[in-house]
Every structure is written in C-alpha cells, then in structure tokens.
Amino acid sequence: MNIFYLHEDPIQNAKWHIDKHVVKMPIEYAQLMSTAHRMLDGEMYLGKTENNRNIKRWRLDDEREDILYKASHVNHPSAIWVRQSVENYYQMYRIYMATLAEYTYRYGKIHGSTKPSITLIRPPKNIPKIKGTPLPQCMPDECKVKYNPILAYRNYYIVEKNSFASWKNRSKPEWYIEKDIMNTWVGD
C-alpha cells in the first residue's frame, strides 16, 4: 500500500509510474478511497477472514456497499492520509483516474478496478472538510526528503525500484538515473 507521488500534475505523475505500478496501483488507490468511505460512513462490525479469524469490517447502508472494496490496511499512513481531509481524498481520486487512463494508454485495455470510479468520485459524507495535509513518505529513511514527497518518491524509485523499472510506450523520466551510477543522493 502506497501512493506514488512523482509529480504534482496527476497526469504527469501517472506517466512516470513504472509499468508494474501502472498495473498494480489503480486497485490500491481504489482500496484507499474505499477504506475512507467504509470507515467514515460505515458501521463497524466483526467479520471473519477466510481462516476464520475475527476482523473489523465496515458496512455501508447504501449502494456503495456492493460497489466499493472492503476496508484494507486501515492504519497504514496512506489510508489515514486519504481520509484526513476532503482535499486529500480528491487528490487521491485524481491520481487514481490518471493512473487508470495511463493503464489504457500503455496496455490498450480497461483496468479491472475502473468499476468503482463513478462511485468514488464523491468523497465520503463524513470526511473532514479541511485543507489538505502533507502526503506521508512511506519508504526507507534513506529515500525521504523533508517537506518534499515528490523528490522523496523519485529517490524511492531510483533506490528501491531500479531492478524492475520500465516504462512501456513512454520515455524514461528525465530525473530517473540508474542506481549503479549514483554516488550520493539528496536527502534530509
């Protein structure tokens, strides 16, 4: 679970997602927003996992119940961030939609997690109507850059995602350098 934030513009951000993330992240982005809906607007109950363990679940009393994903990774910093403010939620939605479009551009297909997009366009009813908060940097400390999640996530791509970084039908981002030629990296 993460939010790969490589550029302020969601369309450019999606273009710079590596292939693996263009495939994987739309579902995670939809899960993050679904979790916000369930936790903020739903009623908590104890459910069972496939292994018969107790698990907290949230039931919605409207059409969202059958459309949205189940709550997931509720205490992850990215999940907390999405539900902290309506501005955060809308930023996540724009990233999600741009990544869905990028998937179609690269692979010529509609991503499977497009289904909840119409429902997710509306934020949870009970989300705080406050300004956005800083995006969490969910990565090793060596990649983090204080007050700059964009540079931090670019570092993260270079340091941690180098072995499988590829961009189908896209040029490599100009900021992307190969890890083996990197001497030191910017950080704070």
At which residue positions do the language-model features occur?
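Sequence termini and other peripheral, non-core segments
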Residues: M1-N75, A79-D188
